Regions:
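Short, solvent-exposed loop/turn segments at conserved positions within beta-propeller repeat blades
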Residues: 59-77, 130-136, 197-198, 283-290, ...
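Beta-rich, blade/repeat-based domains predominating
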Residues: 33-45, 78, 99-119, 137, ...
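Short loop/turn segments that connect beta-strands within beta-propeller blades
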Residues: 85-89, 143-147, 206-210, 248-252, ...
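Residue position within the beta-strands of beta-propeller blades
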Residues: 49-52, 122-123, 194, 237-238, ...
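A short loop-to-beta-strand structural motif that recurs across blades of beta-propeller domains
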Residues: 77-82, 138-141, 201-204, 242-245, ...
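Beta-propeller fold detector
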Residues: 28-29, 91-96, 149-158, 213-217, ...
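Blade-level signature of beta-propeller repeat domains, shared across WD40, Kelch, NHL, RCC1
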Residues: 316-345
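Residue-level signature of beta-propeller blades and closely related beta-rich strand-turn architectures
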Residues: 54, 126-128, 198, 241, ...
Length: 345
C-alpha cells in the first residue's frame, strides 16, 4: 500500500509499458498557481474548469480515526474550483470546499466536476468524520450560482452501510478509508457514475434523489480503479495497477481490454483514439517529472506522445490538444505549485 495523495490504493508491481520511448516532452505550461489540481473539464460555456484539492486545515477527527498508514489527518476548507481564462488567469468559481491533509503531506479534497443540464456538480473525495469533517462527508455536491455548495449525495454513509465483498486492509500497513475515496465521475444517462478507489467500486448517483447504487464491486480483484472512459456502448475502467477493463453500459460482465501500463490516473477516448495518462514512468515509480501520455489506438498499437510530466492527474481534450494538470500531489502543505500544460496531438 503506497500513499499517492493518500489515494489509499493497493498497488502491486510496476510493469514495463509496451510503448515507444518518448523523446519529445511535447508540452507547454498554460496556467499556474493551482493547489493540488485534480481532474479538469471543459464546461458548457467552453471554458476549462479544474478541481483543486487544497491542503486541508487543522481540524482533527471527530470520530475514531481511520486505522491506516497515512495518519494523522487534518481537515479543512481549502479546496477550490477554478475557471482558466484564455490568458491563463485563474478565476475562482467556488472555494472553501472540504478536504484534508494526511501524515505524508498529501491531500484529498474536491477531485472532479461534471455538469447535468447546465448545473455543476463536484465530487468531494476527502470528507467525513475521520478527516475532521463530520458535516461534510465524501460525496457529491451541487455548486450553486453564488459559489456555495449543497450536498446531493452522501457517499460516506453509503460506504459505511454497504461493505464490499473484500474490505480494504486496516492497520499500520493498511490503506482502509471508512469514509470512502470517490475519485472521479462521469455523466451517463442523466446520472453521475462515480469511481470509488479505496473500496474498488463503481457507483451510480442520482443527483435528483441523492440515491447511491453500487454498480460494480471489484474488491476481490483489487485493481484500484481510478477513471472511466466511454466509446459508444462500451465503458473502460482504468486502474492504478496499469489495467484497463471494459464492460457495457448495463454494468454486466467485466473483461480485460489492455494491461501492463504504469500507474494510470486518467483516460480519454475519442473515435478510435485512446489517450492514457501515467503519473510516473514504469521503470521509475514515484519519480517526479516522469509522467507520460500514451496514445493507444484501438488496433492495439501504443505510442508515447508526451513525457516529463510532474505527477499529473487530470486530462481533458479540445480539438487537437490535450490539457493536463501537473504537480498535482507530492508537494506537502504548500499552495500554488500546480500547473496546467497543453499537449499538441
Amino acid at each position: 500500500m503506497i500513499p499517492l495523495l493518500c489515494f489509499t490504493l493497493a498497488f502491486g508491481a510496476i510493469l514495463q509499458a509496451a510503448a515507444q520511448e518518448c523523446t519529445d516532452p511535447n508540452w507547454e505550461v498554460i496556467a499556474a498557481g493551482l493547489t493540488n489540481p485534480r481532474n479538469l473539464h471543459f464546461g458548457p460555456d467552453g471554458s476549462l474548469y479544474v478541481a483543486e484539492a487544497g491542503i486541508g486545515g487543522d481540524l482533527e477527527p471527530t470520530c475514531e480515526p481511520a486505522d491506516n498508514m497515512f495518519q494523522p489527518y487534518r481537515g479543512g476548507y481549502s479546496g477550490r474550483i477554478s475557471r482558466v481564462l484564455p490568458d491563463g488567469t485563474l478565476q475562482t468559481v467556488a472555494d472553501g470546499l472540504p478536504g484534508f491533509l494526511d501524515g505524508f503531506g498529501d491531500s484529498l479534497g474536491v477531485s472532479d466536476i461534471a455538469w447535468i443540464e447546465g448545473t455543476m456538480y463536484a465530487l468531494i473525495e476527502g470528507g467525513g468524520c475521520t478527516r475532521g469533517l463530520p458535516d461534510d462527508p465524501a460525496g457529491v455536491v451541487r455548486i450553486n450560482p453564488d459559489g456555495s455548495y449543497s450536498y446531493v449525495a452522501d457517499i460516506t454513509a453509503f460506504i459505511r452501510a454497504n461493505p464490499v465483498a473484500s474490505e480494504p486492509l486496516c492497520g499500520p500497513f493498511g490503506d482502509c478509508e471508512p469514509d470512502g475515496v470517490p475519485h472521479s465521475m462521469m455523466v451517463h444517462g442523466g446520472k453521475l457514475v462515480v469511481v470509488e478507489t479505496n473500496h474498488n467500486s463503481v457507483l451510480e448517483i442520482d443527483p435528483a434523489s441523492g440515491s447511491v447504487t453500487r454498480m460494480l464491486d471489484l474488491s476481490v480483484q483489487d485493481p484500484a480503479p481510478i477513471i472511466l472512459g466511454r466509446k459508444g456502448n462500451d465503458l473502460f475502467l482504468a486502474g492504478f495497477d496499469g489495467l484497463i477493463q471494459m464492460f457495457g453500459t448495463s454494468f454486466g460482465s467485466v473483461s480485460t481490454f489492455d494491461q501492463d501500463y504504469s500507474a494510470i490516473v486518467n483516460l480519454h477516448i475519442r473515435g478510435n483514439d485512446m489517450y492514457v495518462l501515467e503519473t510516473f514512468a514504469p521503470e521509475m515509480p514515484w519519480t517526479p517529472d516522469t509522467g507520460r501520455v500514451i496514445h493507444r489506438s484501438f488496433d492495439g498499437s501504443r505510442n508515447a506522445i508526451a513525457c516529463g510530466l510532474n505527477f499529473p492527474i487530470g486530462m481533458a481534450r479540445r480539438g487537437n490538444e490535450l490539457f493536463v494538470s501537473v504537480t498535482s500531489y507530492g508537494q506537502g502543505p504548500v499552495t500554488g505549485l500546480g500547473q496546467i500544460v497543453r499537449v499538441r496531438l
